[in-house]
Amino acid sequence: MGPGCDLLLRTAATITAAAIMSDTDSDEDSAGGGPFSLAGFLFGNINGAGQLEGESVLDDECKKHLAGLGALGLGSLITELTANEELTGTDGALVNDEGWVRSTEDAVDYSDINEVAEDESRRYQQTMGSLQPLCHSDYDEDDYDADCEDIDCKLMPPPPPPPGPMKKDKDQDSITGVSENGEGIILPSIIAPSSLASEKVDFSSSSDSESEMGPQEATQAESEDGKLTLPLAGIMQHDATKLLPSVTELFPEFRPGKVLRFLRLFGPGKNVPSVWRSARRKRKKKHRELIQEEQIQEVECSVESEVSQKSLWNYDYAPPPPPEQCLSDDEITMMAPVESKFSQSTGDIDKVTDTKPRVAEWRYGPARLWYDMLGVPEDGSGFDYGFKLRKTEHEPVIKSRMIEEFRKLEENNGTDLLADENFLMVTQLHWEDDIIWDGEDVKHKGTKPQRASLAGWLPSSMTRNAMAYNVQQGFAATLDDDKPWYSIFPIDNEDLVYGRWEDNIIWDAQAMPRLLEPPVLTLDPNDENLILEIPDEKEEATSNSPSKESKKESSLKKSRILLGKTGVIKEEPQQNMSQPEVKDPWNLSNDEYYYPKQQGLRGTFGGNIIQHSIPAVELRQPFFPTHMGPIKLRQFHRPPLKKYSFGALSQPGPHSVQPLLKHIKKKAKMREQERQASGGGEMFFMRTPQDLTGKDGDLILAEYSEENGPLMMQVGMATKIKNYYKRKPGKDPGAPDCKYGETVYCHTSPFLGSLHPGQLLQAFENNLFRAPIYLHKMPETDFLIIRTRQGYYIRELVDIFVVGQQCPLFEVPGPNSKRANTHIRDFLQVFIYRLFWKSKDRPRRIRMEDIKKAFPSHSESSIRKRLKLCADFKRTGMDSNWWVLKSDFRLPTEEEIRAMVSPEQCCAYYSMIAAEQRLKDAGYGEKSFFAPEEENEEDFQMKIDDEVRTAPWNTTRAFIAAMKGKCLLEVTGVADPTGCGEGFSYVKIPNKPTQQKDDKEPQPVKKTVTGTDADLRRLSLKNAKQLLRKFGVPEEEIKKLSRWEVIDVVRTMSTEQARSGEGPMSKFARGSRFSVAEHQERYKEECQRIFDLQNKVLSSTEVLSTDTDSSSAEDSDFEEMGKNIENMLQNKKTSSQLSREREEQERKELQRMLLAAGSAASGNNHRDDDTASVTSLNSSATGRCLKIYRTFRDEEGKEYVRCETVRKPAVIDAYVRIRTTKDEEFIRKFALFDEQHREEMRKERRRIQEQLRRLKRNQEKEKLKGPPEKKPKKMKERPDLKLKCGACGAIGHMRTNKFCPLYYQTNAPPSNPVAMTEEQEEELEKTVIHNDNEELIKVEGTKIVLGKQLIESADEVRRKSLVLKFPKQQLPPKKKRRVGTTVHCDYLNRPHKSIHRRRTDPMVTLSSILESIINDMRDLPNTYPFHTPVNAKVVKDYYKIITRPMDLQTLRENVRKRLYPSREEFREHLELIVKNSATYNGPKHSLTQISQSMLDLCDEKLKEKEDKLARLEKAINPLLDDDDQVAFSFILDNIVTQKMMAVPDSWPFHHPVNKKFVPDYYKVIVNPMDLETIRKNISKHKYQSRESFLDDVNLILANSVKYNGPESQYTKTAQEIVNVCYQTLTEYDEHLTQLEKDICTAKEAALEEAELESLDPMTPGPYTPQPPDLYDTNTSLSMSRDASVFQDESNMSVLDIPSATPEKQVTQEGEDGDGDLADEEEGTVQQPQASVLYEDLLMSEGEDDEEDAGSDEEGDNPFSAIQLSESGSDSDVGSGGIRPKQPRMLQENTRMDMENEESMMSYEGDGGEASHGLEDSNISYGSYEEPDPKSNTQDTSFSSIGGYEVSEEEEDEEEEEQRSGPSVLSQVHLSEDEEDSEDFHSIAGDSDLDSDE
């Protein structure tokens, strides 16, 4: 059998297949002409052998076909009908020695039975379905399928494989020669003995040659089982069958037991004899006789497999899966316990192992792990892969049988199909005809071009010589071509060609001729298919014309060699190193490995894997901010200390400083223990933000020498310290030891300059930059203070490094570049993914607000665009207003998220935005930031400003490009961070040398040399050689040169000497431009100079003094002079005028600063007078300040004094030191300029004069050009003209602009007039007309056409000019309420809150509280079994025992559905969880205890919030309210809405009658009434009894009778409404009676209280009203308004009245008379009549009706819920806050009075806020919240009702009324545009709201 697949698939057999063998036998036996051929029954009688009787019925050919028909599945019936016990026995049991079938005792004769055969299709399908997938093996191509039926194939059938044979396991056992006693399970290389050993299973798969059997197996099958696959073998004698070929030989495509494929069996050319096959066989046969006879089976097996591979038919089967795609069962079996079989090794093996070395070569190779797991000893003794040696007693029989079978196959080879060689291209093409034996034969023929290129040059008419052939083929004509050559033939595998690999083929693992030894892995370094290392990338040398350059190179080669020898120029051998050179075959020196390599950008010597801390890699928030504002960006390189708002350090006072020595040692010990516990070695400790603290570990300080480094690491990022060392030539002592870092030996320097031999340079190196560092000694007096919120810590500092200039390795993206935008996008996406990962909900969800908070600069649309990729926005349901993760979206893993954005990308982005902010602060617009395109970059670099050129996106880009060799760096220039030439300027310059303007080189005279004696063409050869002798060139070298080579050397050497300033023959010098090589050399020298200088300066330990530094004032003087000149040219002013203006401006600025400083210090300033008039100003607040008074003399001789303020401490110290220690003479000398300074001044003056000349020249050019074209600039200026100053009234600036003349006069009143002036109107007309180009006025004859825009603009100007504007200061002072003078009440002040805030539904507030309690319970430990409903599949009997299940998720859903209006219902359901757990688990179970702890936590939380929850429950259900009036009104309102309005066809009575539709209604009906009006009265608490309520209800019926008549349908409906009302009142009679009594009692108590308060003595004033009659209906309103005055003076506490509880009283205050609250807001009282008349005048028509109508549209039942404010706190009602009680009156009279005057007035002005509280009392009632923050009363907020919210329009109207007060239409007209403006205020006075703005 096929040993390859045998090895591979026996693993699967041991695991899966042994127990599930098919019950049915395979059809192979019968189909192949076995003893039982059931197909024979169709054509005649069957003899005892199971074959057809007689020879006359069918001829031999038909019988052959008949034997093949067994493949139709008929053969499987025999085994079931006759031999059930075959499953346990072997096939050989039924076969006699001659191959005939024996009859058994229980055999039954079926010949006479005429029955319909049962349908066997199911069994056949089952058998077909049990085919195994194919498997290719590395060892052999003959495979066999086991006939077992895999369960997995039933569950999910694989793609249909090509049909393969199915054999019974019994056959395989006999074939493989396994003994019957159950010993022979065949194992692969490492496989454990399986428990399935009782059934011997041999599992194999099939390749394309499924039907072929190995020769060894074929012979065994014939000898042991007697089963032959020959046609009609069953009716022949055994000896006769040997002479016949088998059916598989005649028809290789035949499959025993399968459906016949005739096109495959009898295809065209199937039986054509193969010409070459017999010859091949004979050769092999001769060869085989010489070798061992065991190899016969190998060769024959390969031959048969090759035959079987021939197929002209293509099938649509799935391809056989390669072995790597099959399940690796070796792993499973290898992990199983292994029973060692090494003890079974024979003596032969021991003899072999004795000769081996002690340790086997293969034992510790790549497979060491597996050998260790199998327990293989070191010497490898006893290891046999589980193979077994061949049994010796059977060998002669097997050999003879194999030889016999092989001879038989050899004799019958003529009938076989074509061999495999016939399908090779070499046998199909007539390639012999194309061989050119003689070139003369094809000289006149044309060759095919594709073959000609392969054949090489052949002489022909077209290509007579090799050169012509090369030109035709496009080859380079030169012989010294540098391109590498490759062989067209693949490299031979020596093992395949010369090795005995066929000896290692495993034909039978159970019968091995010898045991194989594991091979030793060897890699051939010469194998081109092996990639042993990553090859270096070679940059292609781009050149336009290589051929020209090569010509120049060859022609100049000699002169170059000579010049190189004389030292004029240097030969650069490494320039030609980039291209591979043809190596001299005799040069064995390997010089190319010793050449210095070109240094690339990332010269990472040694490993450079940087492992950042986990918080940095995860981009956690504080370390990697998502947004940085301008202030943070300005402080990016120098972050200030954070001010703590809480914690110990937020308070002033002494704070202790803790040492850290013990903490450091303790932490080090802990980390060492952790390292040891993990097995020692390196360990990564930076895992949490706490690990990043400086309170433990080793610390070093690194001070960056650059002010604004191009790249800065964020907190938590790592860097390496590398110690670069360059060895000395010869004997090197090695690198000196360093305390920090790893030593790296480098030949080429990773910096711009190279290291000297023996030099060591330390460097920071990470993925962002490489920078040299220089260790300095830390002064002993220095230490480190670590500040946290809790306190200070101190620790020692050991070392400090100075960091040199960075060499960027990471490019900073430019603003708005694609890389920057991509980073922003990915950063946002990563943030969103992490938010989803943090979400605890399922499905995961997040809110948009969380993202907008982190990314405030992002638009919502861009965030939404990122979110839509992974989430959906839910508008309804439980997840409303959440973004929920899509169900089909897979969140990226942490590794994938980290790969999206790296910390280095963030750092580069931060560097970019910080630099962008610096440029914006410097005044550069965004257009100057854009990074240029590649092509224009060098030109662009020359044009942009120096500041932009130094931006990090330009410097990093330039440095990286320079390191790649694309350009050079400027080295010295504007981008030098030191500013003094000690650093590199990273600005691009081209590789080619350019003439610098400021080059100090001696320039040759620019004159033509043609025809002069300097013309080199006229120089004779003799004179030229003479010149060379003068230059010192040896004579023998001169003789070697031709004429023009001599001239070339003369020119070069003359140029060199002329450039160095010497040499008499400078006339022959040509060109001052350096060559590229010289330019590169100069560049390297300059880089080296600066590099050495930087190393010297930064490593210097010399202490520099700052005292001797000169002041920078002189430089600023020069700048001022330059600015003055420019201003003089622009403004045509003299220098004296300019200086005066500037001094005046400085004086004003200084004055303003002093005023500001004085006001800020508020009296803390103290003045220290000094003899030198040095004043320290404001030293306590703003630091020291030096004021220097200088005396000047103007042109007229008058003296004046100016004060100069200096704030720099260093300048102050220097000035004071000089003043106090030196005399006047020294100071006078000090002030005089020295010689050097005068020289600098002269240079500066010359520069400024040159600038002046240039400006004049430009002006003259402009004059010559003529007047410039006019450009429409008005379009740009128009937006500015729309601005109007609020201070001075001018147009074009705002009041905050410094150009405003009133900018510094902050307290001066604005000077805007009452109406617009004519000038302002004209300015306004200019701004209003927008389009200048459009013709606004057209004249057509006598007709003038005015544009529509003109008329509209005129109307607008007219309307705006009529608007009166009143400044705040000119308004009459508003009346403020009296404030208590006691200081101790300051803490009662509350922040200002708007009156008309939106009210929150109390159900929402209650639900949010309950949900927070659920969250707290869910966070308790071990509560997860109660989080979700019990799974019925897991706990099957739960729902049989528990009838009312409950869990936290269901509880949360109920809360969100607003199903719990009170605490009791919520707690009841929670208690249900405890009861259910006790019922199912038992009361003592741990789960029951956990649920009880949840209930206890809930009770605790409910107790904490008891007051708030009680208020919310009362608001939800007013019947729970302590105020009886609220409950009474609630019942009445329910009667109206749920009963009376529910009467059918009652809609005409729901709202007032519309006057438009029924014009005469209000003439007939004097007192109209409807259900809506009744509801308003209810909401205003106008009904204290049922009688008053019924009066209004009956009035509806009476009005209907009066207007419609008693018989009208409307009247009947009204009667039904009244009946329903009476009926419902009867139902609630008992409850309503009790409420009426309580209301009456409370009313009487209030009246008594009012009488007591009215007796309080009070001095009457001019505005103090006399207390009117309480029962007078006309004065009741004013009494209610004025009564609060008495109450204000009384200072009575609410607690003084025993008749009501505090809660009741506070709510009663809200329901008291209409005027109480209004007057409480007002604080002062007016005359009652005056107030009514005044407000009557200011009444706007229908205002109250509109408010009432608008307010009632939004909810049917205003009492269904009382809403509290969103915060939910609202200052508890029952807290006993001191609030004055207000008097009570007869409510009915008051309310009737209010009702009568409703159409006449509304309360506005100062009492406006209260009036809305009263008139819209259906919106808000209860306790009132006052807006005045200075109020000493503790108040509660209004609550709205039943999910009822004030509409936004009403809010705006009410706020506008309160802000602007009453508006008298006859006097003031407010324009539509400016009604909302803050400049407009009421005439009567500002409201309280305005005073707080």
Swiss-Prot record:
Phenotype for D329A: Reduces kinase activity
Region described as Interaction with ASF1A and ASF1B: spans on this chain: 1363-1650
Glycyl lysine isopeptide (Lys-Gly) (interchain with G-Cter in SUMO2) crosslink, residue number(s): K570, K583
Record flagged with keyword Coiled coil: no
Positions bearing Phosphoserine: S137, S328, S1690, S1693, S1799, S1802, S1820, S1847
Basic and acidic residues: bias regions: 995-1004, 1139-1148, 1254-1270
Chain positions covered by the region annotation Histone acetyltransferase (HAT): 538-997
Catalytic activity: L-seryl-[protein] + ATP = O-phospho-L-seryl-[protein] + ADP + H(+); L-threonyl-[protein] + ATP = O-phospho-L-threonyl-[protein] + ADP + H(+); L-lysyl-[protein] + acetyl-CoA = N(6)-acetyl-L-lysyl-[protein] + CoA + H(+)
Necessary cofactors: Mg(2+)
Known regulation of activity: Autophosphorylates on Ser residues. Inhibited by retinoblastoma tumor suppressor protein, RB1. Binding to TAF7 or CIITA inhibits the histone acetyltransferase activity.
Quaternary structure annotation from Swiss-Prot or TrEMBL: Component of the TFIID basal transcription factor complex, composed of TATA-box-binding protein TBP, and a number of TBP-associated factors (TAFs), including TAF1, TAF2, TAF3, TAF4, TAF5, TAF6, TAF7, TAF8, TAF9, TAF10, TAF11, TAF12 and TAF13. Interacts with TAF7; the interaction is direct. TAF1, when part of the TFIID complex, interacts with C-terminus of TP53.
Protein function: The TFIID basal transcription factor complex plays a major role in the initiation of RNA polymerase II (Pol II)-dependent transcription. TFIID recognizes and binds promoters with or without a TATA box via its subunit TBP, a TATA-box-binding protein, and promotes assembly of the pre-initiation complex (PIC). The TFIID complex consists of TBP and TBP-associated factors (TAFs), including TAF1, TAF2, TAF3, TAF4, TAF5, TAF6, TAF7, TAF8, TAF9, TAF10, TAF11, TAF12 and TAF13. TAF1 is the largest component and core scaffold of the TFIID complex, involved in nucleating complex assembly.
Family (UniProt): Belongs to the TAF1 family.
Domain text: The Bromo domain mediates interaction with histones that have acetylated lysine residues at specific positions. The second domain also recognizes and binds histones that are butyrylated and crotonylated.
Disorder named in the UniProt entry: Dystonia 3, torsion, X-linked: An X-linked dystonia-parkinsonism disorder. Dystonia is defined by the presence of sustained involuntary muscle contractions, often leading to abnormal postures. DYT3 is characterized by severe progressive torsion dystonia followed by parkinsonism. It has a well-defined pathology of extensive neuronal loss and mosaic gliosis in the striatum (caudate nucleus and putamen) which appears to resemble that in Huntington disease.
Name of this chain's protein: Transcription initiation factor TFIID subunit 1
